[in-house]
Each structure stands twice: as structure tokens, then as C-alpha cells.
Amino acid sequence: MTRMSPGVLAPPRELLTPEQWKQRGRDQRREVPRLSHAQWEPPLDRPDPVDILEEQARTRVPDLVPIRYGRMIASPFAYFRGAAAPMAWDLAHTPTTGIRVQACGDAHLLNFGMFAAPDRHLVFDVNDFDETLPAPFEWDVKRLAASFAVAAREQEFSDHDARTAARLTVRSYRTEMFRYATMRFLKVWYSRIDIDEVTSLFDAVQPK
């Protein structure tokens, strides 16, 4: 019989009401206040990011490593896309609430897109799970928010706009998690963003 990692298939350890989960969150916020996420100082023993990438390259196809590096040096965002491992090292030295999830592991904005669901409906969702591992939920949220900020700056938006994009990303995560907290497990499992919903959002922000 094949052994299975518990991951997201494991039943929840506790069955709490949405209000109880909210209180649990407030309690954890006292231990890890939101302001604790606003600052980051590199640890004195922080390794060179290139060394991390070189260590990672040992497990890759040798002929493809130079191609990967060539793509990463094209721009700051291209480097960010390829540098999930160095960022994971940095995130491992940041505050967390201890809430672990089956993380995407590389939740930058270009790892979201459209694809056909099993029922052939077009949906918008995470489309890359090759780095997935159990990890603190904050890591995915921070990498996603950072990706919007880096992309905004690369496109020559102002620092204010870049911060706004990151803030709205985190706000959207928070509001959706609040909505999911009021839903039953199967309702959450089958929840999805249909392409018509995405199209309407884009249409709403287009200049008239």
C-alpha cells in the first residue's frame, strides 16, 4: 500500500466556527503583530543568493542551467521569478504565526493564469505547483505581494503604486480567506474563478 503524505488530504485537526477561528487569529496576532512583518534585516549569516542557486543547480539538467541563468539576468523581475529558493531562505528568517498550509512555494503573479478545468470550463488559478511543500501561509502571500511590487517597479510605476499593488494583493487574500471561513469544506473545495469573472474585472478598470 502506498504511503501518502498527510498534506491537504488530512482531515482538519480542529472543527471551529468562523468566529472561533477569528478569535484564534486575534490571539496569534498578539504573538506576531502585523507590524512585525513590515521590517526585514538580512541575518549576518545570510548566504550569497548565487550560492543558493548554484547548490540548486546541482539537481538540474546541466545543459539547461546556463539558459536558466541567462533568462534570470534579463531583468529584476526575471531574477525574482527564478529566485524562489533564495527568497525561501529569507522568508524562513521572518516572523510567522505557525499556521502551515500546503504552499504553492512559488506564488509570483505569473504563476497564475487561465486553464481548462476537468469539466472543460476555463478558470483562473495557480497553474504551477512544482515547488509545493508544507510551509507557513505567510510565505506564499509575501512572495505574491512582492512579485507585484517588483513587476510594478520594472514597468516604471511609482513606488507609491508598487506599494499600493502589494497592499491590495494582501487585502484581497484577507477578504477571500474571510469569505472562505464562512463556507463549508466542499464549497471551498469546488470554489473557483471563472474566466467570465476575470473578464468582467478587467473590463471594469479599462478606460472608457
Q: What is each residue range found by the language model?
A:
Residues 6-16:
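General secondary-structure propensity
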Residues 13, 68-75, 95, 99, ...:
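Conserved aromatic-histidine-acidic binding/catalytic patches
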Residues 14-33:
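Short acidic, low-complexity intrinsically disordered linear motifs used
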Residues 32-78, 82-85:
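Low-complexity, highly charged intrinsically disordered N-terminal segments
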Residues 80-92, 96:
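Active-site-flanking structural segment that lines cofactor/substrate pockets
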Residues 98-104, 108-155, 163, 172:
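Catalytic activation segment of kinase domains across protein kinase-like and atypical kinase folds
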Residues 149-208:
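Contiguous mid-protein beta-loop-alpha structural module that forms a pocket-lining wall or clamp
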